[in-house]
Amino acid sequence: FQDEDLERSVWWCSGFILVALLVYAFSYVRKRRTKVEVKHWLASPFLNYLFPCLAVGISVFLLIGREEHQEVEKICRLDHWIEDKEWEKVLQSIRPEDAKQSLLQQHWALLALSQIGELSERMFAYGPTGTDSFFYSMEDGLFREYFNTSFYECLGSDNGVVHSAFQAATQTRYGMSFRALRTLIKANIRLGNTEVAEKYLVLLQHSTCHARWGEAQRKKIADQSRLEKHVSNKSIGRLLQGSRSFVVEMAAVVDHYPEDRKALEYLLCGLLLQKDLDKFAYVLHEYAFRFMNRLPRHYEEALLVVGMKHPEVLEVFSVDKTKIEQFERFYSMLQKRDEYKWMLESQFGDSFWFYYYCT
């Protein structure tokens, strides 16, 4: 389930079951041509054929029905969608309440929101507690390393992709996995290291399920050899492995690539999670303001909080009147927090205001 589509696996299993049934039917028809006298109940067809099938069916049902197995299946399915960049499927599968209970699902959901451009609109519904919700700075686990490879790939840092893929491979049982190999092949093709990519393709071709995928990658290599060598345009260092924080790393990326909206959104949302509103307002004015026709939801919410201390900020940024009315209602309820605590969470639990004042 980790490396292949579940639907394809089910079709293979169903095909083998059908072959087994055909063999049984053929042997049963041949037996009927010869009279066989059954003298003992142990030789009954029920015990010889139906009972084993029933036992296998019950065993499979009990295995599939176990909660921990369903959780593993969901994790593998989500990782498969992340690798294929099926962001909408990821968000449809991960509910906000699930993300609050599972850090891995929370990371996946926030990455998917970033990719569809809605991180600054819906982030707080998924319960982030800090910038650690964006990236695993201290990797501990195979799927966390897989997440980091996807994170680097989404930011366009293929050097980071290769490093994390090797880290993931070392945590597998055999020192390498199909997932890591596929990641290394794609990253090296983008980097222009076609010889290295071909080496990994030779390893992967010995598997049973990657023939068509390998052909597609070899076609990319052939096409690339006819074009000018392409090198990834970003070389982001190993995030959060030294003394620098996630926000500082994103600030460095934005400084080098001011047109990178994904890194800019991560920077702004990271400042919101750190509750550093003065720097948020500065970065928004210096970098992001010229890119936006309208302010995203969480940016408006943050600016209204800044405006309480620095009213002149609201003269620079235009905030929707409806949002201003919502903030006034929230703040009036906040003054009576003990009385309206449950209403604050139910009405504003997915807002920056609730995160800033109540967590």
Question: Residue locations for each model-derived region?
Answer:
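Extended alpha-helical scaffold regions
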Residues: 28-41, 45-48, 159-160, 188, ...
